[in-house]
Amino acid sequence: FNSFPTNICFKKGMIKMAGNTLENMDKSSFSPMMQKYLETKEKYKDCILFYRLGDFYEMFFDDAITASRELEITLTGKDCGQAERAPMAGIPHHAAEVYAAKLIEKGYKVAICEQLEDPKTAKGIVERGVIRILTPGTIVESNLLEEKKNNYIMCICKTGLYFGISVCDISTGEFYSSEIKGENNFETLLDEIARFSPSEIIANSMMFECQEEMDKIRERFSIYMSRFSDKFFSDEVGNLQLDYNILENKKEIGNLKERTLVVKSINALLEYLNETQMTSLEHINTINIYNLSKYMALDINARRNLEITEKMRDKSKKGTLLWVLDQTSTSMGGRLLRRWLNDPLLDVKEINERLDAVSELKDNMMLRGDVVDTLKKVYDIERLSAKMTYGNANARDMITLRNSLEKLPEVKNILSTCMSPKLKQLYEDLDELQDVYELINKSIIDDPPMTIKDGGIIKLGYNAEIDKLKTATTEGKNWIVKLEAEEKEKTGIKNLKVGYNKVFGYYIEVSKSFVSQVPDRFIRKQTLTTGERYITEELKNLEGQILGAEEKVVNLEYEEFVKIREQIAKNVKRLQKTANVVSTLDVLSAFAQVAEDMNYCKPVVTDNGKIKIKDGRHPVIEKMVGIGNFVPNDTYLDKDGDRLAIITGPNMAGKSTYMRQVALITLMAQVGCFVPATEAEIGVVDKIFTRVGASDDLSMGQSTFMVEMMEVATILKEATENSLVILDEIGRGTSTYDGLSIAWAVAEYIADKEKCGAKTLFATHYHELIELADKQEGIKNYSIAVKEKGEDIIFLRKIVEGGTDESYGIHVARLAGVPKVVTKRANEILTSLERKSMLSGKKQENKKVVEGQFDMFNYKLGEIAHEIDKINLNELTPIDALNTLLKIKEKMK
C-alpha cells in the first residue's frame, strides 16, 4: 500500500506508516515480541499475517490497516517499543476461518501463525510459526466450500507457443494434467480454464511476460492469479516418485518423460501446495494425464451461451442444464455430474456403456429406489478422506465417515443384481472398506465432542490404559460424592456441597448463613456474594488424584485419536476409489430418474455423422414450463447430405431456443444421458461452436461487430465436418449490405465439404440467404411457422421446411407493447420502403449473382430506377434526355 487509506481513523500516538517506511526502520529498536512478528512477516510479505496472541489473531501495521478496512473491524494500536504504537486489528481465534474467507474472497492471501508451545510452560517469548497459507485455490474447510462444486487451482507453464497445465482440488485429491500443442494454443488454454473454472491460477514468468494473453485471461475470468518462481518448474520426473510417491511404475515415468511441459507444471503445483499447506499431500496420489482429444471441445462461448452449469447473467445454477439433471443424492455425485457435463465423451463405446447403465436403472424402479435411498445416507467420503490425510479431521468427521462406510455393503448388494457392463464394473470396483469401518466403530464413541483435545472421544474397551485411568477418575468422583455426604454429617451444614471449576479446581461451598458452623480444618479458598468456598487436605489429595488421571486421559485420548486418523489416512487411495464408484452410481441413477420424470428417450449414439432428432425439446425450458407445454421439433443434419440448415422467421418465434435445444440434446447424449425427444440418433460431435448474440467488449476496445467477427473467424478456422455449429443472426453489427455479404460468404464456406462441412444451424433475418439452397449442395431451408389472424400473429414454435421472406418485426413490436401510434407509423414506412424495393428489383424471384455483372447488393440501382420513374416522357426534349442520361451514367461510376 503506497498511500494511506483515508477511511481509517488513527488514534493519537499511533504510528502512521506504510510498508516501505517500516522496512527502513531498525528492527532491533522494536520490542522483543514485535521483532519476532517482523521476522515472520518478512517471510510472508505477500500475505496478511494472522499472528496468534492468546485467544486472538492479531494483525499489525499495513496488515492491520487492510484488515480494518476490508473486514470492517476496529483499528487500534499496540505498544511496540517505539514512541508511537503500531496499528493493530484483531479477531477471535475461533472466528478465524470466517474472516480469512472474507479476505480471500477479496483477493488476499492469509498466513496463519500459531503458538507452537504452551504459553504456561514457555520460557521467554512463546515460539510461533506459520502453519498454513490460505489462498482461493487451497481452501479445504467444508463450510467454506460448495458441496457440489470442485475448488480447483491451476498451474500454467508456458514455453514458446506451448502450454503445460496441471489442475488440482486439494479438498478431494483430484489432479489432472495435460499439454497444449498445435494450432490455436492460447484459445485452447482459455477453453481449459473455462472447463475447470479454477478459483486460482499460478504461472511461470514467461506466462506473465505475455501481457496480451494475461489481459485476456483477466478480462474473461474472475480468477486470482500469481507468479510462481521459475525454479520450481522443474522437468525432473524423479521428484514425483521420490518426494510425492505419485508415480507407481516405470510405464508412468516413461510416459511423463516425453511430456516436459506437463512435468514442469506438476512439479510447480505440488511445490506450491507444499509451501501453502505445510502438511501431508498423501491424498494426491494419482495424476490423471488427460488427452484433449478424448472429450468434446466446448469453447468459452459455447459454455456460456448453452448455460451448461451456470446462467450467463448471474452465474446461478437455476435455469441451467446442470439444474435440470442434478438429482444426485451425494455431494460427490454432484461434483462428478458437473465434470461430466463439462467433459462430454467422444468414444462411442464409453458413451453407450453409460447409456446402457442408465437404461437399466430407468427400467427398474425398485433398483433405482434402492440406490437413491441408500446413497442419501452416504456423506462426502472424498473430502472426508482428504481431511484425514490433512490431519484436520475431528472425531465427528470420523463418525460421519463410519456411517457412510456402513452403507457400502448395501450398495454392493444392490450392484450385485445389475446386468449392464458399467454397473457390473462398479460392483467389481467397490471396496466395502470393512476394516476401516471396524477401526472407527470400535474406537470412537457415537456422539463425540467437536474438539479433539478435551477427551471424551475413545470408547471403553479400545485402550486398556485409557480405561484404567477413566476408572480411577470415576472412582475419584465417587469418593467426592462420599466426601460431601460425610462433611454434611460432620458439620451439620445441610446445604454444603462439593463443586468444581477449571479456575479453582474442587471446593466445598457453604452459604453465608452457615459460615459460622464451618470447622477450623476448612481453608478459605474464595469469597462469594452468597457464601464462601473452602478446601480441605482430604479434598486436596482427591483433587490431585482425579485431575492427574483426567489430564493423562485427555492426553492419551488425543494421542490415540491421532494414531487412528493416521491409520485411516493410509487407506486414502481405497477410500477415493470407492468414492468414485459411489459418485458414478449416483450420477447414473440421477440420469435415470430425470429420464423417467421428464419422459426422455435413449439416444442411439454412432459415428455416422448424422443428427436425427424426432420431437426434440429444450430440457431447461421444458422443466420451467412443465411437461406437455413445450412445442417439440424435429432435426435432421448429415455431414454427407443436409449439412447446413438456414432458419428464417420472425424474432421471438423460437429460432434461438430451437438451435440451443439441438446443441444441448447432442451434448446430453455424449455425456451418456437420455435426451428430451421421442427418438434421437446422434453421430458423435467433436466440437460445439455457438455464435449467439453479441455484447460490446468495451474493456478490450472492441465493438459488437469486432467481437462477432472474431468469434466467426475462430469457428471457420477450427470447425471440422464432425463439428456442430450454431450461428444466430451473424452480420447484425454492421450495415445491411456488409452484414448480408458476410453472412452469405460464411454460409457458403461452412457448407463446402472441402473447406469445412460442419453440421450447422444458421438462423438469419437476411431472407436473401434462402437462395443458397438452390445454388449450393448441402444447404436446406427451414422456417418457424406463424399463423396470421387479422393484424395479429401467433408463433406456432414449429420448424417447417422451406424459407420465408416475412420478418413480422412490427407485429413483434406490437406484442412487446410499443405504442400503437409508433407501430402504425412503422407500417406506413414499411409500405413505402417495400414499394421502392419492388421498383429496384430487390424482390424479383430467382435473382442471379453473376460475376462481372452488377452486384445484386448494389443499392444505387434503386435510386436510379426511382429517378427514371419520375421522368415525364411527354415533356422531355432530346437535349434533356441526353443530360439525364449523362447524370445516370455519372451515378453509375
Each model region followed by its residue ranges:
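Amphipathic heptad-repeat alpha-helical coiled-coil/stalk segments that mediate oligomerization
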Residues: 233-241, 296-297, 312, 403-478, ...
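Charged catalytic and DNA/RNA-contacting regions of genome-maintenance
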Residues: 13-360, 369, 373-389, 393-485, ...
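Short, amphipathic C-terminal "tail helix"
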Residues: 394-397, 873-893
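Conserved catalytic alpha/beta cores of large enzymes that bind or transform nucleotide phosphates
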Residues: 193, 198-206, 538-571, 675-677, ...
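Active-site phosphate-binding and catalytic loops of NTP-dependent enzymes
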Residues: 113, 136-145, 280, 419-422, ...
